[in-house]
Amino acid sequence: MQERKAAVNRDTLETQISVALNLDGTGAAAFATGVPFLEHMMDQIARHGMIDLDVRCQGDTHIDDHHSVEDIGITIGQAMHQAVGDKRGIRRYGHAYVPLDEALSRVVIDFSGRPGLEMHIPFTQKRIGSFDTELFWEFFQGFVNHAGVTLHIDCLRGHNAHHQIETVFKAFGRALRMALEVDPRMGNAMPSTKGTL
């Protein structure tokens, strides 16, 4: 099977980003983004998705984190799209429930080629430390638009905002792992009756 790796650079007047990933990795991660809480969350994607993920960003964080967070989501989405290739042989769909103490989240993903995001997280705080929780929407919307996936995110319960979003990212990683897994029974077939995704 062809290696499922990608490296993408994205340069704008607001951010300069590089992302390298390996879908068949061991969960190794390295980050230098200037946004520490997002790095903590991306580490969950790598660890629970068994994806090697390296993300570097120089952004205008002296203004705020918005551009960096959104553009990192975009660039990871572009790299994911490139690494997946034509999607032959993958399971395509993935889902996971993940708890953390009182919090519980569900994430469902479809590598359909159709970008779509439904995200429902009733955050109990507007900020986690200095991080604005509204930016998680920007991260996932950027990812979805450029990975070409349908993504449903629901935090079902929780009263600690850190726990709420950590369960989301852990479930996201596990759903990715399931969807991207190669199904030996599929052979080289496309996981769609249309014959294309």
Swiss-Prot record:
Molecular functions (GO terms)? imidazoleglycerol-phosphate dehydratase activity
Q: Where in the cell is it found?
A: Cytoplasm
Q: Superkingdom, according to UniProt?
A: Bacteria
Example of a GO biological process term:
L-histidine biosynthetic process
Q: What UniProt keywords are attached to this protein's entry?
A: Amino-acid biosynthesis, Cytoplasm, Histidine biosynthesis, Lyase
The EC code for this enzyme is: 4.2.1.19
Q: Does the keyword Translocase apply?
A: no
Pathway it belongs to? Amino-acid biosynthesis; L-histidine biosynthesis; L-histidine from 5-phospho-alpha-D-ribose 1-diphosphate: step 6/9
Under catalytic activity, the entry for this protein gives: D-erythro-1-(imidazol-4-yl)glycerol 3-phosphate = 3-(imidazol-4-yl)-2-oxopropyl phosphate + H2O
**CC terms in the record's Gene Ontology section:** cytoplasm
**Residue spans crossing the bilayer:** none
UniProt keyword annotation of Protease present: no
HAMAP family, alphabetically?
HisB (MF_00076)
Name recorded for this polypeptide: Imidazoleglycerol-phosphate dehydratase
Species the sequence originates in: Teredinibacter turnerae (strain ATCC 39867 / T7901)
